[in-house]
Amino acid sequence: MFQDGASHEDIAQGALGDCYFLSALSVLGNERTVDLFECQQDSNHADETDPNHWKKTGCFMLKFHKAGEFQYIIVDDYIPYNNMGQPAFTKGGDDGLEMWPAILEKAYAKLYGSYTAIEAGKVHMALADMVDNGFPEQLALKTFMNNQKLFTSRLRNLDKVQALMGAGSPEHEMGDRAINEEGIVQGHAYAILDVDDYQGEQLLQLRNPHGKSAHTSEWNGDWADDSEKWTAKAKASLNYTPNDQVDGVFWMPNSDFLNNFKYIYICRELTVKAGWHCQSIDS
């Protein structure tokens, strides 16, 4: 199931149009992803209280939070394959040995009724289905087009509270077959892996859920993997090693992000520790 923990590097989109869901998986992180896998606790069936029970039987129980309520989904480890003998939908890892993305995708499809039912969606809503007390929010980036300073501040605050984020590029009549001149797939969901500042410039690290597949495209502007901006100091500061191979992961300035994306998808975890705050404006 998990060969080496859960990482965004394990996820590569297949023939299913669920880039939003896979982008959500990409930002969950190892701990949250592993926590989605449950074993059934039933005192009347001793074998089923064994955490390895579902591994032994080839079945898995997963916990979601649809509509604010826990929902448990049980699936087996059979996944659809295409006529080339490869997973038809999500592929896990370069060697295909990471099973967790395909199992989670299958469980999510069962949660909503079918694989077809989970085609096309929003990153923040998928995150809310997988995070305890998740509060989803969608922001239209045109709101910040004339106020980059406000966007920089908003993004910094979201990163500070460890909000989970994704992004959506503008729709296109060709769907995600269209790629703009800067290498951004159109009508496509991306994961926001990190937000950081370097020498006074705010940067975002994003991931195309196509991963290392043949359909992958990457940003080719400032801070792209082949950019001269990647000095030894920059690599160390941002903890990033540019990859000669297109793997879907890249950094870009927030100014270019505003010009190339249409929405930012946010899911914040509301906890008692964080507290509640109320603001009102008198009319």
Regions found by a protein language model. Name each.
Residues 1-283:
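Accessory/interaction modules and long regulatory regions
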